[in-house]
Structures are given as structure tokens and as C-alpha cells.
């Protein structure tokens, strides 16, 4: 304490002497010091100004809001050192200036010896009660070209970064929520993030009740700049066929405000081929029919664009407001489901068929978000989202024998959907490390569907859900726990159908840290699933001459019971993460095939049960810290599907691997993902065998990568249906996405005052309070 007072007094009197020694116009250097983990202001941090040859010029302490101000005669490659007891010292280079300068928020990283409520691993990961907090290293930030690329370099368990399909996904198809500063975001938003603006990444592998049904939540916490801005753009394309992704982002900062304009576009013009075999077993005694389709190349075309305008206003440690408007448009004149080919009935060529679907949609969205930090570690969050979607789809199926048209089906579906989402969240952190959170979320949706085949049929649907939850978590030594309960009120109305139901969602999480390197975690949760609007559409839709489908207005909500056991170990350059996930669904909604009036009808029903067991082990090696990471991911899948008139089981063993390496300005990334088969109802949906190999070169402003998709194995997807009435198998493949080369180019410019922060591993300047 005496040392701190002495240093403060020393800095104060030295500043007075150095400031008023001469009658010159002074330059003011201002900024704010925050905690990198919590984004809270740090009071009494020591800020020292040094000349280019490391001569001490002046020093001050930050105030209760983390702000500081230092006066000096000139700035010629001067730099700041910022330190505080229990934190790593930061160095901020100021460059040359004759005007007053304002640094970005200076985020200090806590040192491991001062952390009481978290477990710290060697790679800068802080294991808190409800999430892992990852502080990217300087090398990881420097070798990343965007927020997406940084996420890939972090190699977080279970996440698959699919830059071809523009998604961050799980192998099992579960929901991944992407957030930026707590606000729900999309792939394009993360693509627009500059790595240097990212303070930390928060990884929730067992999200709390506020996140709904998400299996993983990734939240990027960014710093706020007081001035200047940036422009960046990226192009990801195959120069030989129709594959292009493009993004653009413009940001401008002025004091507490930030203005941003971003855009993302995607274009596909590819060819796919399908071959299928199926049998029709007629219960009325007709001879069984064996049918084969030998497909030819069929085009798939898609144009997607999504511009976004954002304004945010914030003061760290007090409040944060953001308003964003997004417009999304997608036009697919040739759908992925299209197929054209010869038809063989009982091995005899009988003609040809052509299925052609096309769709387009447009969706404006307005998102308002407000966060207020109160006294005594309390936070209030308010969020309002309004969204409209107009969707148009046409389906055409034609089958010919020679010049004779045997089957001609054509129908259209036009829908207009209106959403309003209102949410309020309250959080309270206690001195003992405990945390209480509660929230109320209301979703109101209206959907109007116009179906037209021979006549126009209009269906109006109203659906509302109110969700109230509370959750409490606490750390007791090496033991962490979280307990919560959620209550949902679901209101569904369609014509004369009216249903109101209440469901409950209890949740329990237990975590035990055996040592700083070993942990185990167990989670159990219960939640309900409501029928989708599409599944309750009663209108008949013809598929071909033998099949049709329709929804079911008598569908009921069903419960899902999920248990997750996970454990992890990390020591030096090696880490292992094990996850065993069991999900049981009671009376789930699954399709059923019946024979009705001489045709086969697909209709959803509440079936008996569905079981899904998944085990996955992620082994990660880092023989050269921050330079070389190698990972192996073996796993097993087990399914049991129990319908009202069928039972099927399926087991799959799978194996994946990845490698990330960098040397100076060169980078190498390899991803080898085995197919993830998914079985539900009576159908096995084969996943994609996906490989991505790329090598690149990056400077501070420019980067270029060259790579290849699926260099070692041709791309294909298979499916099998085990129905007793209509067993089938199909195979989809494409030469366009097999051995597909691509290039990825990015360029960014920063303007205005820019400052570079460097974490100091060794501090020999002295007198900094550490």
C-alpha cells in the first residue's frame, strides 16, 4: 500500500515538473484501462510514458472509471506502459503526432496467480463457472485475417469452420449461436471482425437457459476505439467454376459512437448428379415396383446478398446500445434438390423425368439492444427484434415416356412471416463468485401461406411463445454448480384449431476441477420442442405420381431429456477433451409413410421415442507453441428410432483430424472431417466427407491464400430409407466440389489514430507497481 502511494505521488509530482518546465503547447494522451476478462474499468492502474529510447517522461494513475490523461511536449515514437498488480503489463506504441491522441481501450490480461474464481490453463484459457474465456495470443491475432480465421486458429473443441458453406457448425447439426459483445450475430458479422479488435472469445459448451436450445455459444468481445476507422474486404473464389464468397466492412469511430456498414455475398453455379434406387411395396396386392433413376448433370444456382448497417454507442463499465438493420435476399433459380435422368421400372427403361424446384426470399430485420451495468455488479439487458420474411417456392415434376407426358405436377407456395421478439435479462454477481440470472422472452409470429396446385388454398397461422427462466450458479472451492428452471407458454392458432400448453425446462450443471489441468463436468437438462409451422400445414403437396405429403394439425409438443458428461486434461503441449452426449426424445415428431388411396403418403406424427448417443474425444498437440497445432478427433454415434410401426438402429465410427501451422508471415491449414451420419425416422442421412487444405501469406494489410476442397477424396452424399413400404437409396456427387481449387484474398486499411498493444513478457523498466 505504501509503495503504491509513493509511486502515485512520484508520478504526480514528476508530471507537474515535466509539464510546466517550459512555456510550450502540450500534447494530451488519454485512454481507458479495462479488464480483458470482464471489460470492467481498472482503477489506480499505473500508466507511464516513455520516449523512443526508453527514457521516462511522465506517469499517472487511472481514475475510478479507468480513464487517464498524460501531458507531454511532443510525441516522437513514444510509448506507454500500463500495469496493475495481478495483471500482465501492456505496452502501447503511440507513433509520431503533434495533436492530442486517444488510445483504444487498453485491456489488461489477468495473471494466473491473482485469479481465485477461475482455473487457468497454459494456453491463455480461463475456465470460469459457466464458460471458457480464451485470450488470443499476439501470434494468433497477427496470423489471423478475420474473426472467422481466428476462430479456426483457436481450434476449439467440436466446432467446424465451414468457409465454403459460410457456417460455423457442429458435426451433429446442433445449433451454434454466434454473438458479438453478447448480441446474436451471423457468420458474415464475424467474418467482418478484425482480429486486432478482439479482446477475448467466450466459449460456452453447455450454454445456460438464456440461450435456448443452442449446444454451443461463441461470444466475441471486442474493444471500442475512440477515433479512426477501418475498411476491409475479402474475396473467396474458385476461378474455374461458379463459386464465390465476398465480404466488405467499413467502420468509423468517434468518441463513444461507432458506425458500421458491412455486406456479404455468395454465388453458386455448380453441377450435381444423383442416382437412386427404390421399391414400392403395395399392401393392396399389386406387384411390387422396382424403380431406378440414373441422373445426369443438373445445375444448382444461388445468389445471396446481405448488407447490414449498424450504430453503437457505449461506455465501458456503464452502458451499451446498438441498433442494426439487415437486409437478406436469396434467389435460387435452380435448387439443390433438382434432378434429371432416365427412369427404369423393373430394370426396363421406361422414360425420363425432371424435378425442378426454385425459390427466393427476402428478409429485412431490425435489432435493438441495450445493456446497462448497475451498482453492486448488476446488469440489465433489453433486446427487441422485428423481422419480416417473404418466401416464394415452385415445384415441378414431369415424367415422360418418349414424347408422351405421363406425369405433370406443378405447384407454388408463397408465404409471408412476421416476427416480433422481446427479451429482458437481469444478472447479479455476488462477492463470493455466485451469479443469479433471470429473463423473460416473448416471441410472436404470424404466418400466411398461399398454396396453389389446381386451386388456391390460404392458411393463416399464429404462434406465440413466452419463456420465463431463472438460473443460479456458484463456485465452492474446486466444485462448481448451476441450477435453473424455465417455464414456457406456447399458444398456437390455425383456423378453428387453438392450443395453449405449458412446458417446463429444469437444468443442472456440475463441474469439478481436480487440479488446474484436469476437470470433469456433468449436465442434465429437460426441454420441449414445438411443432414447426411447416409440419402443421394441412395442404396436400404432390411429389410425383406415386407420392404426396401433407402436414398434421394434431401434432403435440414433445420433451427432450439430455445428459452430457465431459472431461478434460491439459499439460504443456498436450490436451484431451472427452464428451459423451445422450439425448432421449419422448413422443418426438417424425415422418411416417402410409398407403392411402393407391398412393404413398408422408405425414408427421408423434412417434414412440428417439435415442441418440454420441462420444467424441479431441486430442490436441502443440509441439511448437502458437506455431504448430495438430488435432485428432475419434468418435462414435449410436441411434435408436422407435416409430409407431417401426424400430431401427444404426452405429457409426468416425475419425477427423486438423493441423494449423504458421511461420513468420506464412500459414498452413488442413482440415479433414469424416462424414457425420444422422439417422432419424426411417432414413439414414449420410454426411459429407470434407477436406480443406490451404496455404497463405499475410502482411499487416494484405493476405492471400490458395487452397483446395476435397483434394484427397471425391465429394458425395448418400442416404438410405429403411421403410417397409418404400425402401430406397440415393447417392449425390459432384465433380465441381471434388479437387476444387480456390484463392482467398483480403485487404484492410485502418485510418485515423491507431495504436498497437503488446503484452510484455519481461518488464525491466522498474517503478511500475508490479
Language model region names:
Residues 52-55, 79-93:
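A short, solvent-exposed loop/turn motif at the edges and junctions
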Amino acid at each position: 500500500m505504501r509503495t503504491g502511494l509513493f509511486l502515485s505521488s512520484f508520478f504526480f509530482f514528476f508530471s507537474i515538473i515535466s509539464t510546466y518546465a517550459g512555456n510550450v503547447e502540450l500534447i494530451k494522451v488519454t485512454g481507458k484501462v479495462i479488464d480483458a476478462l470482464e471489460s470492467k474499468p481498472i482503477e489506480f492502474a499505473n500508466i507511464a510514458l516513455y520516449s523512443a529510447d526508453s527514457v521516462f517522461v511522465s506517469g499517472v494513475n487511472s481514475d475510478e472509471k479507468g480513464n487517464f490523461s498524460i501531458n507531454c511536449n511532443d510525441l516522437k515514437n513514444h510509448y506507454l506502459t500500463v500495469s496493475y498488480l495481478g495483471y500482465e503489463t501492456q505496452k502501447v506504441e503511440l507513433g509520431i503526432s503533434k495533436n492530442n491522441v486517444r488510445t483504444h481501450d487498453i485491456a489488461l490480461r489477468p495473471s494466473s496467480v491473482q485469479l481465485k474464481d477461475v482455473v487457468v490453463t497454459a494456453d491463455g484459457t480461463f475456465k470460469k463457472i459457466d464458460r471458457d474465456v480464451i485470450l488470443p495470443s499476439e501470434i494468433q491475432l497477427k496470423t489471423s485475417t478475420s474473426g472467422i480465421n481466428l476462430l479456426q486458429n483457436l481450434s476449439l473443441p467440436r466446432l467446424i469452420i465451414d468457409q465454403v458453406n459460410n457456417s460455423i457448425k457442429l458435426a451433429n447439426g446442433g445449433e451454434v449461436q454466434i454473438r458479438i459483445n453478447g448480441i446474436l450475430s451471423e457468420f458474415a458479422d464475424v467474418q467482418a471482425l478484425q482480429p486486432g479488435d478482439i479482446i477475448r472469445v467466450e466459449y460456452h459448451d453447455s450454454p445456460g437457459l438464456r440461450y435456448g436450445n443452442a449446444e454451443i455459444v461463441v461470444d466475441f468481445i471486442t474493444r471500442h476505439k475512440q477515433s479512426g476507422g477501418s475498411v476491409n474486404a475479402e474475396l473467396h473464389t474458385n476461378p474455374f467454376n461458379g463459386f464465390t464468397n465476398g465480404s466488405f466492412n467499413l467502420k468509423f469511430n468517434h468518441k463513444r459512437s461507432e458506425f458500421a456498414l458491412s455486406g456479404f455475398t455468395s454465388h453458386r453455379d455448380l453441377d450435381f448428379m444423383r442416382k437412386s434406387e427404390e421399391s414400392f411395396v403395395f399392401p393392396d396386392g399389386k406387384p411390387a415396383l422396382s424403380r431406378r433413376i440414373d441422373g445426369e448433370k443438373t445445375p444448382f444456382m444461388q445468389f445471396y446478398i446481405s448488407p447490414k448497417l449498424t450504430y453503437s454507442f457505449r461506455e465501458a463499465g456503464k452502458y451499451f446500445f446498438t441498433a442494426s438493420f439487415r437486409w437478406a435476399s436469396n434467389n435460387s433459380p435452380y435448387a439443390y434438390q433438382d434432378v434429371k435422368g432416365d427412369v427404369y421400372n423393373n430394370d426396363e427403361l421406361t422414360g425420363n423425368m425432371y424435378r425442378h424446384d426454385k425459390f427466393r426470399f427476402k428478409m429485412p430485420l431490425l435489432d435493438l439492444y441495450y445493456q446497462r451495468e448497475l451498482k453492486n455488479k448488476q446488469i440489465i439487458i433489453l433486446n427487441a427484434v422485428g423481422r419480416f420474411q417473404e418466401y416464394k417456392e415452385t415445384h415441378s415434376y414431369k415424367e415422360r415416356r418418349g414424347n408422351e407426358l405421363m406425369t405433370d405436377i406443378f405447384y407454388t407456395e408463397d408465404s409471408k412471416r412476421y416476427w416480433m421478439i422481446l427479451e429482458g435479462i437481469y444478472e447479479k454477481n455476488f462477492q463470493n463468485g455466485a451469479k443469479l440470472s433471470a429473463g423473460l422472452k416473448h416471441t410472436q409470429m404470424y404466418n400466411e401461406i398461399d398454396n396453389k396446385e389446381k386451386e388456391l388454398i390460404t392458411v393463416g397461422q399464429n404462434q406465440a411463445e413466452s419463456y420465463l427462466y431463472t438460473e443460479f450458479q456458484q463456485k465452492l472451492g474446486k466444485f462448481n454448480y448451476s441450477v435453473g428452471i424455465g417455464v414456457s407458454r406456447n399458444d398456437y392458432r390455425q383456423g378453428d384449431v387453438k392450443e395453449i400448453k405449458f412446458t417446463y425446462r429444469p437444468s443442472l450443471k456440475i463441474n469439478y476441477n481436480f487440479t488446474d489441468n484436469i476437470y470433469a463436468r456433468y449436465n442434465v437438462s429437460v426441454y420441449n420442442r414445438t411443432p414447426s409451422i411447416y409440419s402443421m400445414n394441412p395442404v396436400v403437396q404432390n411429389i410425383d405420381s406415386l407420392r404426396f405429403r401433407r402436414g398434421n394439425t394434431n401434432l403435440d409438443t414433445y420433451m427432450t431429456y439430455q445428459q452430457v458428461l465431459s472431461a478434460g486434461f491439459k499439460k504443456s503441449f498436450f490436451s484431451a477433451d472427452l464428451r459423451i452426449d445422450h439425448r432421449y426424445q419422448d413422443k418426438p415428431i417424425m415422418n411416417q409413410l402410409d398407403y392411402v388411396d393407391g398412393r404413398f403418403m408422408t405425414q408427421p406424427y408423434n412417434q414412440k421415442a428417439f435415442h441418440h448417443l454420441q462420444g467424441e474425444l479431441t486430442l490436441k498437440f502443440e509441439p511448437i507453441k502458437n506455431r504448430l497445432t495438430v488435432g485428432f478427433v475419434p468418435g462414435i454415434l449410436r441411434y435408436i428410432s422407435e416409430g409407431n410401426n417401426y424400430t431401427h438402429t444404426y452405429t457409426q465410427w468416425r475419425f477427423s483430424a486438423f493441423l494449423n501451422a504458421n511461420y513468420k508471415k506464412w500459414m498452413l491449414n488442413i482440415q479433414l472431417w469424416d462424414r457425420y451420419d444422422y439417422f432419424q425416422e426411417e432414413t439414414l442421412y449420410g454426411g459429407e466427407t470434407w477436406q480443406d487444405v490451404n496455404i497463405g501469406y499475410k502482411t499487416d494489410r494484405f493476405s492471400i491464400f490458395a487452397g483446395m476442397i476435397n483434394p484427397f477424396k471425391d465429394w458425395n452424399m448418400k442416404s438410405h430409407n429403411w421403410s417397409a413400404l418404400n425402401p430406397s437409396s440415393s447417392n449425390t456427387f459432384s465433380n465441381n466440389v471434388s479437387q476444387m481449387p480456390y484463392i482467398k484474398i483480403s485487404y484492410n486499411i485502418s485510418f485515423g489514430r491507431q495504436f498497437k498493444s503488446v503484452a510484455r513478457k519481461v518488464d525491466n523498466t522498474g517503478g511500475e507497481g508490479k
